Each structure stands twice: as structure tokens, then as C-alpha cells.
Amino acid sequence: MSLLTQIFGSRNQRLLKQYQKTVREINALEPALEQLSDEALKAKTPEFKERLAKGEDIDKLLPEAFAVCREASKRILKMRHFDVQLIGGMALHYGKIAEMGTGEGKTLMATLPAYLNALAAKGVHVVTVNDYLAQRDAEWMSTLYGWLGLTTGINLSQIDHEAKQTAYNADITYGTNNEFGFDYLRDNMVYDTGDRVQRGLHYAIVDEVDSILIDEARTPLIISGQAENHTDLYHKINEVPPLLSLQIGEETPDGKGKIEVPGDYTKDEKSHQVLLTEAGHEKAEQILTRMGLLPEGASLYDAANITLIHHLYAALRAHTLYHKDQHYVVQNGEVVIVDEFTGRLMTGRRWSEGLHQAVEAKEHVKIQNENQTLASITFQNYFRMYSKLSGMTGTADTEAYEFQEIYKLETVVIPPNRPSQRKDRQDQVYKSSDEKYGAMLKDIQDCYERGQPVLVGTTSIENSELLSGILTKAKLPHNVLNAKQHAREAEIIAQAGRPKAITIATNMAGRGTDIVLGGNVAKQVQIIEANDALSDADKAAQAQKLREEWQSLHDHVVNAGGLHIIGTERHESRRVDNQLRGRSGRQGDPGSSRFYLSLDDALLRIFAGDRVRAIMDRLKMPEGEPIEAGIVSRSIESAQRKVEARNFDIRKQLLEYDDVANDQRKVIYQQRNELLETTDVSEMITSLRQGVFSDLFRTYVPEQSMEEQWDLPGLDAVLRDEWKLDFSLAKVLEAEPTITDEEMLERLLKFTDDVYAEKIEIVGKEAFAGFERSVMLQAVDSHWREHLAALDHLRQGIHLRGYAQKNPKQEYKREAFELFGQMLNLIKDEVVKIVMTVRIQSREEIDAAEEQLSQSHVENVHYQHADFDADAAPEELLAPTAVASEANQTQVNALPKVGRNDPCPCGSGKKYKQCHGRLA
């Protein structure tokens, strides 16, 4: 501890001291509030709302609001917030993370800042890890909020659209992180503002914040669906690879080297890559032109042909790198992948990027539709959009640096209401897994005989089943949880504190439910009270009997030493180990914990195995004897720190790459929202039209060029064939030989204005405006989807730029910016082309066209929170594939509005109006 810390206290101590002053203010208000009638106490809510509306600072309202919420809780829930819960509530209100031990009442604590911030009428989101906890907490606390005059909503995955809108319009909304995220993305895919469900991202309280913002930060949400059908294209492209030859290296006559025999493509089986040579490009372009797939004189690398080259490379890989009965088999008319490591069939799995469809075309079986990412976001970027973010958990301090670095969230460690009596014993390390499990069995048997409940934490379902088999063989009754059935697991966890209870749980199972020593009597009392067959007197008598029995069981467990925690191996994160330990010793209860390890455990084997084995050999440890020493524990902790640091780097790198897409996402979503809220887009269309035709004109009539350099016949042909415009600039020049290029451009723009005006006259301005808006939305959506796929392809190979002495991140940022600019140009061209070439005779036709455009062109939409393996491919982790996700939409004003003259958020240094703002 430094001298300054000794004198002034740590940052945490200073904050707690500051909060204690406010606690004294809140406590001073309690006697007066106790004297108020229920009606007078309820009247405080509208009074607070009125004061906020008149401009009073919400922070100044905190002591009174917290005091009112606590008094209401005493009357309604029969629970009074402890002083430490008031401190935790303050930390949450000020946008910090409150670390509170298990059983300290985080759910009740969250009611304080939720009530205070809901008074602003902008919505409060309480985020949990699963639907069961969201529903449980919402139903439990809605009685309190309702009594105080606030509404509560529950945002579950299975509810319908109207129910979602109702949930979000409530003052306080409970839901899961996945559902909030998916709703955000869905809201940015609607074609009518009335279809949105979210109303803005004002304030979020994230429960189990370490699990959501750290453990799940590497696994973005994805909305995907089946893209448009390219079956014919796959079949046609499939004819190209057999016409191309492989470039090979033949030995020189002296046998000392190799010379390249020219060919059309090269292949690298090690990296599973195939590349066209210069000659191969030309040959492929000629073949595709003959097939009618590539326009005469066009290049495969033109922006318009990005899909074509993608399909061509997929077909080449299918023909040259993927072989039947080695990489896949054809079974019942389907291509089934073979696992290259185990040789097993991977039914249901499909290669991505169109490769699977290319193999299906090669084998002449039915081609399944390609999946396409529709929208994506990471939790890191979603939660950072809230105006104010806070979180609570039992274990955050070990990750405090990451919370501060990534989310700008400070961690405040809240002291327990009663000091912990849990005894954390030294780890015991055995040479083999068999010895370790044998020692664990003895420990469990000893606890069982003494009536002490045991919770065994495992790192995987496989280990849970292994241990369950050992206990079954030893005839020890037990329960197994593996984090799948949330409602049932909460029930089992609630009774895991009964005498002789043995519960095996994977690390995450049962989080959010307290283990009460002696069992959870409240659950059993609820069942009795819900039994209509019993009279009130019988209910009261049975409930009293249950409570007396519980007291006896509780005392028995306390005398036996409280809940005993056994860890079967160390997790790579100290935080997860601390979560397991934290299940015991709640609210000052006694308890104990111990980890049993072996040199076969993954963490020890990789990081500390040799060192510990050397110590055991030197000490000549007999079979079955453990080593229990500080040096071993320190080695393990050091290993965990290394893994944590590596995982932090991975998440930080992921965020740096995703920030590029995030900046572009903000621009697209902001412009899309502006489109949705604009009834008349004719000015925007006019601006786009003039830009497109000016660019087209300058392609054939360059600025400051001589008349001899003009290609007016070529321009006339394009206007006639592509744009269906009966207008000849060659004839204009012939009639007026002295006309300038600027004047000709004006004539062209005037003609396009007249054509546009005629279309509006036929169907009416209002009807045509609706059609134009639908055209723009459809163009933005389809090109944004293709752009996401292009970013995905770019990111997958960007780490290879490092071999060329280039910075992959800078290259990714530069190329992503170029792709974004190309996408905006494609959107402009498509919108103008559709609006100018559409042939309409009546209003009915235009209404039908608008309806068709508003329908999604993507079917079978899927929502997924993709699994991510940190150890799968270290190189790719630093330039990871884009994983998409679904997330809720923010209100337009929830994203910072970019002014036309402000710097563009893409980082180019240009003004927004000259960069990504040019679409608008």
C-alpha cells in the first residue's frame, strides 16, 4: 500500500465514505416517512416527477427517492433495504458497477436506482442472463413498483410484437441481454416507425454484469436468413473450373530446382486456398462473358461483380480442394461434411461463404439456399449506446481494469452487511485425476455423514456426469445441474442448503438464486398458501409448522459448518472460482470451500504442471498424498492471470475491429431512421438523381476536355438502353455546335427532372413519395446486408497482411472505408435507376410495388448468439470473423446526431457531408 493510499484511503474507500454521508441523509428521513399514510407515501411519486419536469437535478432527488422506495418496500415486500444496499444503489445510479457478495440482496438493491431513474419517464432496462430470472425478478418487484405508481414490463423472447411494445413502454422493463440486443437490430429493419418496439436506450442496470459484458463479449448476436436463390448461378459457375488448368512446378533438368509451368490458378492445400493467376483471370473473364454472366469488357474485380468472383472462387475451391469421401460424402442426395480429425459425419453442419452450395453444384445434388447475415452487433457496442450504464455482480473486482478500459465503468466493492465467516482452505493438488476424485469422494462422504450440505462446482457437463457416476456407485444421493433448465435448477439450488444435500453444478448453473441454509422455506409456504382446499387457519398452522422445522434444519446445518463448496478444478478465470466460493457464507453464514486439483487438469498441465510435478517428486510424495502449499496456489494464480490477460487482449482486439463496422452501422441506422420519419423524400431523390446523372455525364464528357474527347454516341446509348430515356446529346450538339459541356449537362438534368415530374403527375405526389421511400429502404437494407458479408470476408483474411509488413487493423479500416463508399454509390445508383425506369400507369400499380418492396426478401430468419472458442485459432482471433447478432433499435436521438459539418465518425478526417453523409 502506498503512502498516499494510507493517508487518503483508496479510491474505493473514499467513494464509500462519500456514499455514507448520503446514507445518513436517507436514514434521517425514515422516521417522518413512517408516519405517512399509504396514500401520502404513494403521492410522492407524482411529486418527484413534477419536480424533475421543472428542472430539478435527479441527483438531488436521490435521498428522498431512495427513502420513499425503502419505506414502500417495508410495507409491501416486508423487506427493509440495508445501509449497504443503499450504497450499492447509489453506485448503480451514478453509472458504476456494484460488487456485492452472494445473498446480499442485489435484486432488492436494484429497485432503488430503477425507481429513481424511472421517474424521468424515459425507461429503465434491468438486464438479466435468462428469461426465468427476468420473469422472477419482474413479478417479484412489480408489486413494489406498481404500489409506487410505476409500470413494469417483461421482455421475453417468446412474446408477440404488441406485448413487446407494451413492455418497452413501461417505466421499468426486465429482460435478457440477448432479447434487448435482438430488439435493437429488429427495430432497425422495420419499414414503418409504428413497428418499432424500443423507445430509446436511457438507463440500464445489468445483473451478472461480468457474465454479460465480459464472458459473452466475444460472442456477438446474429440475425440471419436465407438469401435470394442463386441456384442457376451456382450451376453455371460450376462449368468453369474444369476449363481452367492448375499451375504446377516441374523440376529443372539438373534436379536442383523447379520451374513454374504456366496455368490458370495455384492452390495451397495447407491453407486451403486457391488463387487465379493473371492468365487465369483473363481466361475466366472470357468464359463468363461467353456464358452471358459478365458484360463485354467488364472485369471480375469491378464492384458490380463482387458476387460473381465470390461464386467463382467457391466453385474453384469445391473442385480443387474438397474431395468426395475425404472431406464430404453424398448421402440421400445431400452433401454431408466429414470431420477431418475424427472421421465422423457432421450432419446438419454446412460450410459458409457459398462453398457448400458450390460442392452441391459439383455433385449435381439439390442446392440449399445460402444463409445471409441481416444484422449484427456485439454486446460491447450495444451496451455502450445507453446514456447511462451500470451493473451488479458478486465478482467484478478482478476484471475492474477491463470494465474501466472498455466500458468506462468504475467498480465499487460494497462491504457485506455482515462479515463473511466462510473458510477458504488451501488447494490440494494430486498427481492424477483418480487420486483427486478419490479425495473428493471422501470429503463428500464425511460431509454427508455429518449432515453438512455440499455444492460441487465443475467446469463442464462431462465432469458433472463423471462425478455423478462416482457418487452413484458410492450410493450417495445427489442432484445434477448443467445450466439448461433454468426454472428447475433454481428450485434445486434453493434446496441445496438442506442437511445431507449433495448438489453438482456446472459453474454458471443456478446463478441468481440464493442457497439458504436449511432449505428455502418461502417456496414451500407459497405452495401451501396457493392451495385453495385449505382454510386460512390450516394454511397458517402448516406454514408455522414448516418454519419451525426449517429453524431446526437451519441450526443443524450451521452447527455442521454451513455449506461446503468443492471445486473439481480451477477455471481459467479467478472470477469464476470466486463465484463458486461466493455461493457459501451468504449474509454472515458459516461455510467453507476447497479446490481439488490434479496435474492432469488443463490449467495446471499447460501452465504449472512441470513445476508442481518437480516439487512433488523432490518431496517424494507417496501415492494419494496431496501437496498443499502457498507456492502451488501462487503458481496457479499466476497462470490464471496470464490467461485472463490473453482473453482481455482478444476481446480488446475484437472490439477494435468491430468499432469500424459499428461506426458504419451508426451512420446507416441514423440515415435509415431519418428515412422512416420523413414522409416526402423527393428532395433527397432529386439530389441523388442529379448526382448520378452528373457522374454518368462526366464519364463520357470529362471536365475541361476537348470536344474530340467526348463520347456522345456512347452516352446516348447508355441513356437509351440502361435508363430508357429518349434523349440524344449528339443531336443537341449537332443542332447547337457552340454549346458547352456545362450547358449540355444542364439540358440532361432538365430532361430527367421532366421525366420525374411526369411520373409524379400520373400517380400523385403522396403515393409516389411512399414508393420512393420503400425503394430507398429496400436498397439500403439489401446493400447493407451485402456489405456485412463483404466485411466478414475482408476480416477473415486481414491478419495475413502482417506478412507484408502492413498493419492489419489499419488495412482493415482503410478497406472497410472504401467498401462503405462503394456501397453508398451502389445504393444511389440503384435507387435512381428504379425510380427513373419504373413504368407506371396508375396509383394501384405504385401501391402494389411499394407493398412488394416492403416485404422482406429473406426467409427463415434465425436469431443466434454464436459460440466462440478462444483457443480455436489464435491468429484469426486477432482478426476475427464477423459474427452478427440481433439487437434492439435505439430511438433516433439515442445515437449522437452527426452534423453535416462535423467530422465523419468513420475516422477519415473529412466532413460528414463530404464523406458518409453524402447519401443523405
UniProtKB/Swiss-Prot annotation:
SMART domains: SecA_DEAD, SecA_PP_bind
Catalytic activity: ATP + H2O + cellular proteinSide 1 = ADP + phosphate + cellular proteinSide 2
An individual GO BP term: intracellular protein transmembrane transport
Residues at which Zn(2+) binds: C904, C906, C915, H916
Cofactor(s), by name: Zn(2+)
Top EC class for this record: translocase
Cofactor binding, note field: May bind 1 zinc ion per subunit.
Binding residues for ATP: Q85, G103, E104, G105, K106, T107, D514
Compartment(s) where it occurs, according to its Swiss-Prot or TrEMBL record: Cell inner membrane; Cytoplasm
Keyword Zinc: yes
Cellular component terms per the entry's GO annotation: cell envelope Sec protein transport complex; cytosol; plasma membrane
Family of the protein in this entry: Belongs to the SecA family.
Protein name: Protein translocase subunit SecA
Organism: Janthinobacterium sp. (strain Marseille)
Taxonomic path: Bacteria, Pseudomonadati, Pseudomonadota, Betaproteobacteria, Burkholderiales
